[in-house]
Amino acid sequence: MAFVLSLLMALVLVSYGPGGSLGCYLSRRLMLDARENLRLLDRMNRLSPHSCLQDRKDFGLPQEMVEGDQLQKDQAFPVLYEMLQQSFNLFYTEHSSAAWDTTLLEQLCTGLQQQLDHLDTCRGQVMGEKDSELGKMDPIVTVKKYFQGIHDYLQEKGYSDCAWEIVRVEMMRALTSSTTLQKRLTKMGGDLNSP
């Protein structure tokens, strides 16, 4: 009986360690997926951005919030998650299917979904009871407004090729910022369960 109890205790301790399945660490895989998504977005370029200069718009990327030190660790994870979720939602539509090479678009959506899946394993552990407050956080509201502006712009421009090209370039900026945020979270310790 003592042996079984010792074995169970050891199993619990290992589960919560860096190599355990219950710890919530930002993995190297997450960063590799992020880089691959940026590479795919770059390959999706169909038009010269210079030919679409008349369609340029400042969407108000909250770059200083994402890349600066404004976010606390408990805010950084939900912001990262929301940015990836909104990016996925933007590209996983009928309108985007008509605008892009289907293979590249599917690969991008799969890559974004893989990042979200990895973060989903952490989400419940990190957010816990705070999840109900997620939609009320100012940084989350800022991210949602940013993406709503992108959706509104596309609709206003009739989902034209130039509008999508402007959005593609903007999404490269946004995903680069989210990658910077991932790196910041990793520097904060990577373990999203710690304070």
Swiss-Prot record:
Disulfide bonds join 24-122, 52-162. InterPro entries: 4_helix_cytokine-like_core, Interferon_alpha/beta/delta. GO terms for cellular component: extracellular space. Keywords: Antiviral defense, Cytokine, Disulfide bond, Hormone, Pregnancy, Secreted, Signal. One of its GO terms (biological process) is defense response to virus. It comes from the Eukaryota. Constitutively and exclusively expressed in the mononuclear cells of the extraembryonic trophectoderm. PROSITE patterns: INTERFERON_A_B_D. It is found in: Secreted. GO terms for molecular function: cytokine activity; cytokine receptor binding; hormone activity. Residues 1-23 form the signal peptide. IFN-tau genes are intronless. They evolved from IFN-omega genes in the ruminantia suborder and have continued to duplicate independently in different lineages of the ruminantia. They code for proteins very similar in sequence but with different biological potency and pattern of expression. Belongs to the alpha/beta interferon family. IFN-alphaII subfamily. Paracrine hormone primarily responsible for maternal recognition of pregnancy. Interacts with endometrial receptors, probably type I interferon receptors, and blocks estrogen receptor expression, preventing the estrogen-induced increase in oxytocin receptor expression in the endometrium. This results in the suppression of the pulsatile endometrial release of the luteolytic hormone prostaglandin F2-alpha, hindering the regression of the corpus luteum (luteolysis) and therefore a return to ovarian cyclicity. This is Interferon tau-7. The lineage of its organism: Eukaryota, Metazoa, Chordata, Craniata, Vertebrata.
